[in-house]
């Protein structure tokens, strides 16, 4: 957020949309994630710290925009006795049952965070002698919600590997490993794991397009540039 202030985007008076999908309960310098942008999106997917099995919410300080979003999410119906549509709308409204489940969980958010933190610390302690790092954060500024425990393999401990669009190949080396080899190993004992997300600007459908960084325009590396 600090780097955005005075940046090209802010100078051009752009709106800031915050992707706070998995960040509910996390803070940066004491400020809640989801409160930085003009708009923010929070996910209630089944793996999140607060969940309704699906769905999410839109956050904004603008009552006008919030009301417009509510209208669009309920098929953009006008105040008429029949179905009157002057705008394109969608049936995105969350059901009352799911909304009730989600609302009740907020009373237990800090308990959920404490349980996730215990899991994170258990992994951190158990793996401390291996050449890996648990997902890092700035302890002087950030307070995460620990919803996902992930690890980063030290570069010098990585075996040779190459990743295609749907497959990854690697060469086993003594004393070294890679995410694919680790996932194969834990899958063999019926444990769960997965790679973290591939950046959207590197996905095939987007990677030939320009994208915006805090320092201006950018473009993803693709096979076309090798």
Kindly give the residue locations of the regions a language model identified.
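Single conserved hydrophobic/aromatic residue that forms the stacking wall/gate
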Residues: 1-11, 142
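Catalytic PLP-binding core of fold-type I/II PLP enzymes
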Residues: 7-8, 12-30, 62
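Basic phosphate/pyrophosphate-binding loop/patch that engages nucleotide-derived ligands
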Residues: 12-15, 52, 57-75, 174-177, ...
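Hydrophobic residues in well-ordered beta-strands that form the structural core
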Residues: 16-18, 42, 60, 195
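Active-site-adjacent capping/gating segments
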Residues: 23, 29-31, 35-37, 137, ...
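Active-site region of PLP-dependent enzymes
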Residues: 23-29, 36-151, 201
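Intrinsically disordered, low-complexity Ser/Thr- and acidic-rich flexible linkers and loops
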Residues: 158-176
């Amino acid at each position: 957020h600090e780097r955005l202030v005075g940046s090209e985007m802010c100078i051009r008076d752009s709106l800031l949309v915050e992707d706070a999908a998995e960040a509910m309960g996390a803070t940066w310098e004491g400020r809640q994630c989801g409160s930085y942008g003009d708009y923010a999106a929070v996910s209630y997917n089944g793996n999140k710290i607060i969940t309704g099995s699906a769905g999410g919410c839109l956050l904004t300080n603008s009552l006008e925009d919030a009301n417009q979003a509510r209208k669009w999410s309920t098929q953009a119906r006008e105040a008429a006795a029949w179905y009157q549509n002057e705008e394109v709308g969608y049936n995105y409204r969350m059901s009352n049952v799911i909304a009730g489940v989600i609302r009740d969980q907020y009373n237990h958010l800090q308990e959920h965070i404490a349980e996730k933190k215990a899991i994170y610390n258990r992994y951190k302690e158990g793996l401390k002698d291996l050449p890996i790092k648990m997902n890092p954060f700035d302890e002087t500024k950030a307070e995460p919600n620990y919803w996902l425990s992930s690890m980063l393999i030290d570069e010098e401990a990585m075996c040779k590997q190459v990743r295609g669009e749907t497959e990854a190949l690697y060469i086993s080396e003594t004393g070294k490993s890679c995410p694919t080899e680790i996932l194969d190993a834990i899958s063999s004992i019926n444990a769960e794991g997965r790679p973290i997300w591939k950046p959207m600007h590197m996905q095939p459908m987007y990677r030939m397009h320009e994208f915006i960084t805090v320092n201006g325009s950018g473009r993803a590396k693709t096979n076309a540039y090798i």
